[in-house]
From Swiss-Prot:
Protein role: Required for maturation of ribosomal RNAs and formation of the large ribosomal subunit.
GO molecular function, one term: RNA binding
Organism: Drosophila yakuba
Biased composition (Basic residues): 541-550
Protein name: Pescadillo homolog
Domain of life, per lineage: Eukaryota
Ranges where the BRCT domain occurs: 321-414
Amino acid sequence: MRRPKKYESGEATQYISRRAALRKLQLSLNDFRRLCILKGVYPREPKHRRRAQKGSSEIKVLYHTKDIRFLLHESIVWTLRDYKIFAKKSNRDRAIKDFRNLKRRLALFPEIKLDHIVKERYPTFIDALKDLDDCLTLLFLFSTFPSLHLIPREQSNLCRRLTIEFLHYVIASKSLRKVFISIKGYYFQAEIKGQKVTWIVPHYYPFKPQSRQEVDFKVMSIFVEFYTIMLGFTNFRLFHGLNLAYPPQFPSSVLQDSEESLKDEASFVSDRIAALNFELLRTDKVQEDEEELDIDMELLEQDGDSKRIIKMKQEAQEVSRLRTLFKGLKFFINREVPREPLVILIRSFGGKVSWDSSIFAGSTYDEADETITHQIVDRPSISTQYISRDYIQPQWVFDCVNQRQLLPTNKYFIGETLPPHLSPFVDSKRDSYIPPEEKALLDPSLIETHAQSDDDSEDEAEKEEEEAVDQELLDAQLQLAYQQETAEYKKYGGPDGVNEDEEDPEDDDEDDDEEEEEEELDEKTKRLQEEKQKMSVQSGKVHKVNKRQLHKAEVDEHRLQARMVKPRHRNLFRKLIREKQTKEKEEWLLRKKRRTHEANEKEARKTAKREARKEAAAAAAKASKLGK
């Protein structure tokens, strides 16, 4: 039997370097990168790099040999090789100026088909929905790009079309759950088929070209190439699940004969689709969304009243209320407000929305409409205002969605300082410190309790000040009365004018008899109490907890745990302890900042009230002088 040589088995055969993979596949580096992105193959980090690299200490890019064998059987490899042949032949035709043959070759340009790869990577529809976050974020980003060197106009237009179709599904299904505005853009979260899908829509700023190539647009465009196919399949399935026609179409009532529609019907329809303000054509006339919700609630009611079922019932009721949050409300968006995010929100929750027709196509009513209930404004003042509507800032819409109720509009009027816009994407179990404003998102009743506690603390402080003044006056009066009483007592010998030193001899006998009777009664009561104590349960003593001893016991237990950790797990244990300590330190710092901030605010309110009282007292005194 032949003895196996070193690096012929084990970890050395499980990995292959990138150079060896290129030789095996007979591809260039760019084609190999493209193939790996499309197939979802990525580099691996071995446990023992020196063994995996067959004794070499040089750091190389390594892949699993199984992954490279998997790529060998891919049909795209042949298409990528055909690109080389196509480039050589087309360059030859250009060199000899055979334009007829060149035109024929360009018509037969080899195209990569990615349908089978999408089906291979996502065997079920739920798998595709789980991986939809990055897909949507990247496509929404590319939909805002102009035509660049490595990003053709067709690609950005395709991204725009697919993202608009997805937004139409979100509006029609009313599956939006959370929203948030940040520096990066608008965060949206929808619940589709039980899966939470989160994506970012960037802010609408003019594109600024970069002087340096910091971002590799070529690699990103390869991802976009795959994600467009994936989102196309997903949209098709989602639209047919709601019985909507795909590609999106309008009913005949929207396509009325007008000058715009008669000139170019395709552009007219595409503009109205991009407006997100019209209902799409359905393949059936009955809407089954509400019926499905009722069926689910009936199924929940059939089960037992366990905690999980009760929680699911509450969540289902909240979601049903959220779906009709803006029902019956009419909004008008001003020019300075970003249109698309607000249209998505308002229409997803049953509201009606419009804007100035000169901004974008698809407005349904003008600003002068008397039935408008809310006008969204993002400027310090406005010239003409209607009494029949509320003029609010855009944050009101986002906060209403996150708190799942219509908030009062007085804090969001024009020119008002807005309340903090808190993120709903916070895990209360994972994050140790949660500010009171964020707790109010989970429980709106905490807003009132927090405000009441602040008011109560201020009232208590005022009462304490008033009581302190009254107590000083009372002490002074009591001291004066005590001095007068002692003076009279010394002068007249007692309250009735009788001196205590003069005593009657008859009273001594009566006092002795009374003392004997009291002693007998005391003995009887003592006996009764002893008998009761024997029969009754005695009250327990209060056990005082020594915090120092408890802390010492915890420290000793922690040291014992650290000793018992295995040597190979010791670094991991230290890392976990370090993370825990940093988290506790951050929590302590945040609580300290919060305490100092609240103390400063409280002191500022107190000083403001004192100054107001002084001013009021001075004004009253001045008025009384003038009256005299």
